[in-house]
Amino acid sequence: EVGRKCAARGGGIEQGTLSILLRVESAEAVFRVTEIIAASESVAQVGLDESDLSASVGISSLSEYDPFVYARGRMAIEATAAGVQPIGIAHPLGTLPRLLSGDDMLKVATDSKNLGLKGIICPHPSWVSSVNTAFTPTESQVDFYTQVRDVFAQAIAAGTAAVPFAGRMIDVPVDEWAKVVIATSTACSLRDSEKQTALEAASA
């Protein structure tokens, strides 16, 4: 870690601005993923390299079944617990990437999000729009969950931890999910702003 910081300074990289994306490539790495994440405070994201992992455990990649349900799930949970982003894509595109229609790509990206993953590395520009759509909460979702937070706060103030709203029962787990949706929307907006600033700086 000390050597990395010195190298970064020597290369003109401002301290605290370097982010590391880890790729888990072996059976041992899956088993020790928490330890690997903890090796540097600069680790920001971690994902499976499913092609190398296939070789490590002697698996032939086939579209008919997903051999990495456990590995992907463990990585997602361990990364989230460590406060870094788990990234990756639902089977079979992790080992057998290919071009898909916009709708098909949106489904795969949505499946990936629902596996606990927080982003996807896009090897082709055609993936980007569908991936962004899948991982970004819609305005209606943000509006709904903002109302959920308001309604739940009022319920807590009134002395109850469960209240009906819009045909649903709002309780602590729903309020916690509302926090996640709103925080994700805020993070996506911030990243879009950062990208726009970078594009403007590059074209100046």
Task: For each feature predicted by the language model, list its residue ranges.
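Expand to "…catalyze enediolate/carbanion chemistry for C-C bond making/breaking, isomerization
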Residues: 1-204
